[in-house]
Amino acid sequence: DEPSDRRWTQTITTAGAVAELAFAIIDDHSLSISSRLVKPAPDGRDATAHLTFIPYPESPISFSDGSTAELSDDAWDKTGLTSFGHHNWNLTLPESARINWPVLPHNPYTDDGHAATEEARLVVSLPMSETPLSLKLTVQ
C-alpha cells in the first residue's frame, strides 16, 4: 500500500529483525493498527511490538471478559481478551496481546532511577509473526 494522508507504514529494524507497523485512519474516531514481522531475528528470538498509552488515573479499565481494573499501585496483566476500554477510548485486539499495568519508566531525577505510579504507562504488547495482527483504536 502506498502512503497517503490517511494511511502510512513504519518499518522497524532491530537485532536483525524487520517489522512493520501499518496505520490507517478509518474515520474521525477510529484508527486501525496492524503489525507484521517481515524478517525474523537471525538468532530466532521472539519479536514483540509495544503500544504505550498515557493513562487517566481516575478512569478504570473495562475488559471484554466483563472484569475491570483500577490504575493503582497494584500490578496486573491480562491476556486472552478481545478488547478493553479506558477513559473515552476502546481498543480491539488479538487474544495473543498482553496488557500490563503499571509499566514504570526510568526516572533520572531519583537516586536509584525508580518511578512513582503517577509516571506509569499502560502497555499493550503484541507478539509479532509473519501473519499480520490487527488492532482498532476508537475514541468516543
Predicted regions and their residues:
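Short, surface-exposed, charge-dense and proline/glycine-enriched linear segments
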Residues: 78-80
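Acidic (Asp/Glu-rich), glycine- and aromatic
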Residues: 30-76
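Beta-strand-rich recognition/accessory modules
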Residues: 13-15, 47-49, 82-140
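Extended, loop-rich substrate-binding clefts of extracytoplasmic carbohydrate-active enzymes
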Residues: 1-42
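Glutamate identity and glutamate-enriched acidic tracts
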Residues: 2, 20, 39, 58, ...
